[in-house]
Amino acid sequence: MTQFASPVLHSLLDTDAYKLHMQQAVFHHYYDVQVAAEFRCRGDDLLGIYADAIREQVDAMQHLRLQEDEFQWLSGLPFFKPDYLNWLREFRYNPDQVCVTNDNGKLHIRLTGPWREVIMWEVPLLAVISELVHHYRSPNAGVDQALDALESKLVDFTALTADLDMSRFHLMDFGTRRRFSREVQQAIVKRLQQESWFVGTSNYDLARRLALTPMGTQAHEWFQAHQQISPDLATSQRAALAAWLNEYPDQLGIALTDCITMDAFLRDFGIEFASRYQGLRHDSGDPVAWGEKAIAHYEKLGIDPLTKTLVFSDNLDLQKAVELYRHFASRVQLSFGIGTRLTCDIPQVKPLNIVIKLVECNGKPVAKLSDSPGKTICHDKAFVRALRKAFDLPQVRKAS
């Protein structure tokens, strides 16, 4: 299946903010590190028939480059350094780093190369896959249907929050990677801009064009890579946290907690890290139990939770966000990142549950052992056992 009408992507900045944030840190600290990442479809979709169309889009991505107005805009943000931005100006996607095949109906994608370059593929490539699949499966759906669905949800949201003080409710768009299309994401974000509680988007291109605040810090791959970069597996998570503060000592300070479970994270998140990081992000497991653990940890360390922010971003919709806000709003600062349930929530359209995750660093395995066992990713069972032992994780978690 080939011949999609035109390139899906139009800007190098059509990606999640944390990709550039991590890329700058990799550029400065791990310039020569090599990695491999692989695509996973967590659902039962047979996407192999789209391999040729995806390959065409991958080839087209080599023509994307940072435009002058984009360069100037990034230069005005407080956390990018000139050496990185000048390098990014010359960056081009290398399609040779991407292997796309149809494996008996299943879509197989493997990315290999320098981490500083491979890091850029994940989000736009997932967005390409999502848009291509929905283009062929749901050719009559689009912006109008998405906006109609959103308006209906906003009516329910208004009723649901009528008795609440919403002044501390903050919602962000996290919907790039699994969006129905670029046009749908833009339309949804423009509509949400009318709401006082909408504070920004993870998409740098949309943030620039719509004058929004770009949102994001780091992803699982930052912690995963340190499992092989760090000389000691047991201290690799602390090494990742410290390296991030070295790059961003006073900003972008929301730490992701579930690369090796929340409990293992909190054992590493002592008073110095807890004081310097502005907050934590939830991405798997029971969100209420996670939030209670986070608040208890801050209190145990003598830190007022109201000075910290909890970001919830795991499979959220507006109703779940309100439920969490009701539970936690008086005790801690809160933000909510909603993705698929904003940018691909259209009647009769089945969103894709797709990811691209790091599987190797410098030729050796890395793993993610999240608080949702179904999200665990690693080929090497021996490494998973070593990781569990290093972080004192008693529960056996299936590697998939």
UniProtKB/Swiss-Prot annotation:
Database matches in SUPFAM superfamilies: Nicotinate/Quinolinate PRTase C-terminal domain-like, Nicotinate/Quinolinate PRTase N-terminal domain-like
One biological process term in Gene Ontology: NAD biosynthetic process via the salvage pathway
Pathway: Cofactor biosynthesis; NAD(+) biosynthesis; nicotinate D-ribonucleotide from nicotinate: step 1/1
Top class in the EC scheme: ligase
Any one Pfam family match given in the protein's UniProt record, by short name: NAPRTase_N
Post-translational modification: Transiently phosphorylated on a His residue during the reaction cycle. Phosphorylation strongly increases the affinity for substrates and increases the rate of nicotinate D-ribonucleotide production. Dephosphorylation regenerates the low-affinity form of the enzyme, leading to product release.
Keywords (A to Z) from UniProt: Ligase, Phosphoprotein, Pyridine nucleotide biosynthesis
GO CC annotations, alphabetized: cytosol
Domain of life of the organism encoding this protein: Bacteria
GO MF term (any one): nicotinate phosphoribosyltransferase activity
PTM sites of type Phosphohistidine: 220
Gene3D superfamilies linked: nicotinate phosphoribosyltransferase (3.20.140.10)
EC number of the protein: 6.3.4.21
Catalytic activities: nicotinate + 5-phospho-alpha-D-ribose 1-diphosphate + ATP + H2O = nicotinate beta-D-ribonucleotide + ADP + phosphate + diphosphate
Function: Catalyzes the synthesis of beta-nicotinate D-ribonucleotide from nicotinate and 5-phospho-D-ribose 1-phosphate at the expense of ATP.
Family, as annotated: Belongs to the NAPRTase family.
HAMAP family: NAPRTase
Protein name (Swiss-Prot/TrEMBL): Nicotinate phosphoribosyltransferase
Source organism: Salmonella heidelberg (strain SL476)
Gene name tied to this protein: pncB
